[in-house]
């Protein structure tokens, strides 16, 4: 019989130690002769607060109620489980009880609860620790209830794979960081959080050659909340007995308590590889996968043949599957608010560390044009670095990691980070080998939009503003809600003197991204060109608050205020009423030609077809360029004026600037007429 099996048959000190760590109901604490009231406390809570948390009321409340003080009888597993030396039976109503063992309870001071780090839930401002009160003896409650920071996890090896239930309140550690003495990777450059220096007991245990004793020392460190030291000792135990699944399962619990769920999954899979029938590892894997939002993988390990699944986890799995199904249906029809609602419900159900669910929420925000929320949401997802070797989980028919990257790429593109978007979507293609149509579509779209933007930038830089506007327009045909492309095209219109169009595109960009500073700057400048000083002042005042140290914004605001003040004192000159005015006398014609700025005269006849055809376009130009004076002269009604101006053919257009004629055109095209107006306007 192997070394790690023999302890289940020997009534030794090891067995007694294991039994002393079996967390049963609190009302059976009468048969433990060496019982002492101990409170290891939370590794994240000051010692001074431990007494309050150790009361019976506290032990039966939310965060510490994940099984240790439920008052419910334990359910014995039907699975014929092997007793692996040193696997702590833990804090679960469904933990198997060794035949013949004495049921014991712990007083409130000896309370133990699952500790697996702080669940990360996106609440609209990124991932954040979520605390809740939950009177149920099993965790997984919603994060919507009020926090109870006084009741904290105490850091025991977790039961039946139940690594952590949602709603565990935590506080930031104030312990110093020290370099780890071990050789394994403990994250963050081997800098670990401890209570100070590595304890002498830990150093001594690390030098032992008995893997069981090393493991026991690791368990002690775990219960004290010293997860880094516990990991170092479990590593030592594994190096002495590599094929012991209990050691790897315990290490998985410590990793999960440190918030390193993916590595915990890897360790559990190693435990299952060592012993495919090891129930505890399967249960722990199921619980981890539930937190990661991977329903299929969770079901695979929760419903192992011959194993009675934990009913709480089974219910959580079924609820998660329901929310994912409803989310998928809502996404198909574009009901993005329902998508957000179902994702929030899935997270509250326990999938509190799922990158793909947070990415789905980010996608919904993006489709609702809430780009800031989408960016905050997607940036809360940690760097993808999956370790497990299970068949990759899929969401909406896409491998989860690839889906996350696709959403990140689309958010990057919406914010103008085109190069980053291409890198991410290409990486998604390497992950999803099934060539999902959705991933392929995102890849093609991102590349084509980026190409249009690059082409537009090149044309703009060379001064070919009209062609650049067309290039940006091509990109907008592929991505109609890209605020960057709208803002870039607005710059083209501004350079062409088409300020009304510039304002329109800036408005589009700001509808999509209300905090887009560059679009607001461009719109304010366009308002100034149009003489809409009141609107310009309003935009510059917003910019002044957003950019308090920007001297150019301050100067522009002052100029706009001065112009607004002067405008109220200016006389209402002929031609500034945004409509084409009629001129019928020679005197009025001379007055109009002497107006400041540009004056355009349209010599027409109501009986001439060409004149009538171009008249609506002249009205459009009048609205588009409000600083230009537009006039019309009916040659049939004003024969003297037509003769004085030598009008031979109609329609004829004459452009005056500062009282002098600068151009005359006969039967011009729409493009030639507008180009001529903008040329002299600039």
From Swiss-Prot:
The keyword Methyltransferase does not apply. It comes from Arabidopsis thaliana (Mouse-ear cress). GO terms for biological process: response to osmotic stress. The lineage of its organism: Eukaryota, Viridiplantae, Streptophyta, Embryophyta, Tracheophyta. Keywords: Phosphoprotein, Repeat, Stress response, TPR repeat. Induction: By salt treatment in cotyledons. The keyword Protease does not apply. Residues 1-120, 132-157 are annotated as: Disordered. Signal peptide: none annotated. Disruption phenotype: No visible phenotype under normal growth conditions, but mutant seedlings display increased tolerance to salt stress at moderate NaCl concentrations (120 mM). CDD domains: TRX_family. Residues 16-39 have a biased composition (Basic and acidic residues). This is TPR repeat-containing thioredoxin TTL4. Coiled coil: none annotated. Residues 587-674 form the Thioredoxin domain. Residues 48-71 have a biased composition (Low complexity). Involved in osmotic and salt stress tolerance. May play a role in the control of meristematic cell size during osmotic stress.
């Amino acid at each position: 019989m192997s070394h790690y099996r023999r302890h289940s048959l020997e009534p030794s000190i090891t067995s007694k130690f294991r039994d002393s760590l079996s967390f049963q109901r609190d009302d059976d604490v009468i048969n433990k002769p060496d019982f002492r009231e101990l409170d290891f406390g939370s590794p994240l809570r000051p010692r001074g607060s431990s007494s309050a948390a150790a009361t019976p009321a506290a032990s039966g409340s939310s965060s510490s109620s994940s099984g240790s003080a439920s008052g419910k009888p334990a359910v014995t597993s039907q699975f014929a489980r092997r007793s692996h030396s040193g696997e702590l039976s833990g804090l679960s109503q469904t933990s198997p009880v060794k035949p013949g063992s004495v049921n014991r309870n712990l007083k409130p001071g000896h309370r133990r609860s699952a500790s697996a780090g702080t669940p990360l839930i996106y609440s609209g401002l990124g991932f954040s620790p979520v605390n809740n009160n939950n009177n149920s003896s099993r965790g997984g409650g919603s994060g919507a209830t009020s926090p109870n920071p006084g009741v904290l996890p105490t850091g025991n090896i977790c039961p039946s794979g139940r690594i952590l239930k949602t709603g565990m309140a935590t506080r930031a550690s104030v312990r110093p960081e020290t370099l780890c003495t071990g050789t394994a990777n403990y994250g963050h450059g081997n800098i670990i959080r401890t209570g100070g220096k590595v304890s002498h007991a830990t150093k001594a245990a690390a030098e032992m050659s008995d893997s069981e004793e090393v493991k026991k020392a690791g368990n002690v460190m775990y219960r004290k909340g010293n997860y880094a030291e516990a990991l170092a000792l479990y590593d030592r135990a594994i190096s002495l007995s590599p094929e012991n699944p209990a050691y790897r399962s315990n290490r998985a619990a410590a990793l999960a308590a440190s918030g390193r769920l993916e590595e915990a999954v890897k360790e559990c899979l190693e435990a299952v590889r060592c012993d495919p029938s090891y129930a505890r590892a399967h249960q722990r894997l199921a619980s981890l996968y539930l937190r990661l939002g991977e329903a299929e993988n969770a079901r695979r390990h929760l419903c192992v043949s011959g194993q009675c699944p934990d009913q709480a986890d089974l219910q959580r799995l079924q609820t998660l599957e329901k929310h994912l199904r409803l989310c998928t249906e809502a996404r198909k029809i574009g009901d993005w608010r329902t998508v957000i609602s179902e994702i929030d419900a899935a997270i509250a159900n326990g999938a509190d560390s799922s990158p793909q669910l947070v990415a789905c929420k980010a996608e919904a925000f993006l489709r609702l044009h809430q780009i800031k929320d989408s960016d905050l949401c997607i940036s809360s997802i940690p760097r993808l670095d999956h370790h497990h070797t299970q068949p990759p989980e899929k969401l909406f028919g896409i491998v989860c990691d690839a889906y996350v990257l696709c959403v990140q790429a689309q958010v990057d593109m919406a914010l103008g980070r085109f190069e980053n978007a291409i890198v991410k979507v290409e990486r998604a293609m390497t992950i999803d080998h099934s060539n999902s149509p959705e991933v392929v579509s995102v890849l093609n779209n991102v590349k084509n939009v980026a190409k249009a933007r690059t082409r537009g930038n090149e044309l703009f830089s060379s001064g070919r503003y009209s062609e650049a506007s067309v290039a940006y327009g091509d990109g907008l045909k592929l991505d109609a809600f890209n605020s960057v492309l709208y803002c870039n095209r607005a710059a083209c219109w501004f350079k062409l003197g088409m300020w009304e169009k510039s304002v329109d595109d800036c408005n589009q960009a700001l509808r999509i991204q209300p905090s887009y500073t560059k679009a607001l700057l461009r719109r304010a400048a366009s308002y100034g060109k149009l003489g809409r000083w009141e609107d310009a002042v309003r935009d510059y005042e917003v910019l002044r608050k957003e950019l308090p140290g920007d001297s150019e914004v301050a100067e522009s605001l002052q100029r706009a205020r001065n112009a607004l003040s002067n405008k109220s004192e200016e006389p209402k000159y002929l031609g500034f009423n945004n409509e084409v005015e009629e001129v019928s006398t020679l005197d009025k014609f001379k007055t109009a030609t002497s107006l400041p700025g540009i004056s355009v005269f349209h010599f027409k006849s109501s009986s001439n077809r060409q004149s009538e055809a171009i008249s609506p376009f002249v009205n459009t130009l009048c609205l588009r360029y409000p600083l230009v004076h537009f006039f019309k002269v009916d040659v049939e009604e004003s024969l003297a004026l037509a003769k004085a101006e030598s009008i031979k053919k109609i329609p004829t257009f004459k452009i005056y600037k500062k009282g002098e004629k600068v151009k005359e055109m006969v039967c011009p095209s729409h493009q030639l007429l507008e180009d001529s107006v903008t040329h002299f306007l600039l």
